């Protein structure tokens, strides 16, 4: 999971990884044949457009009924294929976006603030659904999130970003890192209120692994 303050480059990183924007420097290496599913932070669809969930999932190419039903079930909205996209609740809309990302059974699922706008219960359900998807497909999951207290309980590895990698590793190691605390304070429950960080006033120790982490 990638965390960091607003404007730190989290969404830019994901868009670069999927090839949606050019690189100023560096390079991205992708395994041949790697299937990537992407759930954007937001997507605007004209509410006057007569677009059903099924038609949305068939863009840009058509899929069979079984594949669509399976993707919707995995995303947590079974039986909604014939519903209008404009009629979906915020949580259902996000799950429809996830279903679209799951259509080709990706090897890597990327999510950019995909739980944004969900209440606490909806967020918890969303993360549980992600765990089920990971178990069913055996895919890797790379996500950007502001839900720090959830991230630190659910993620296997955390990258703290602020225009560069401040620290990374196991969640317990990251929360103990001074670079992370300079950004978010010491209480991850209140971390969203603290976004103070000078990238030039901390040591650039970019790997802080818990010595017991595998």
Residue ranges and their predicted role:
Residues 105:
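Conserved catalytic motifs of ABC-family nucleotide-binding domains
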Residues 176, 184-214:
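ABC ATPase nucleotide-binding domains
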Residues 145-146:
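H-loop/switch region of ABC-family ATPase nucleotide-binding domains
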């Amino acid at each position: 999971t990638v965390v960091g303050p607003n404007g730190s480059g989290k969404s830019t990183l994901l868009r670069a990884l999927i090839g949606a924007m050019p690189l100023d420097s560096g390079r991205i290496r992708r395994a041949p044949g790697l299937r990537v599913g992407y759930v954007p932070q937001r997507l605007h669809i004209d509410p006057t457009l007569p677009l059903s969930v099924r038609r949305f999932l068939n863009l840009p190419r058509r899929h069979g009924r079984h594949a669509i039903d399976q993707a919707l079930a995995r995303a947590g909205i079974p039986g909604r294929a014939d519903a209008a996209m404009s009629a979906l609740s915020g949580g259902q809309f996000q799950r429809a976006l996830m279903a679209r990302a799951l259509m080709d059974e990706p090897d890597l699922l990327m999510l950019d603030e995909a739980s944004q706008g969900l209440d606490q219960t909806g967020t918890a359900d969303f993360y549980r659904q992600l765990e089920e998807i990971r178990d069913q497909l055996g895919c890797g999951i790379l996500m950007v999130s502001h839900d720090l207290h959830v991230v630190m309980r659910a993620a296997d590895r955390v990258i703290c970003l602020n225009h560069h990698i401040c620290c990374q590793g196991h969640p317990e190691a990251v929360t103990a890192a001074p670079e992370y605390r300079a950004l978010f304070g010491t209480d991850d429950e209140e971390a969203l209120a603290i976004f103070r960080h000078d990238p030039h006033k901390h040591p650039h120790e970019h790997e802080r692994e818990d010595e017991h982490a595998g």
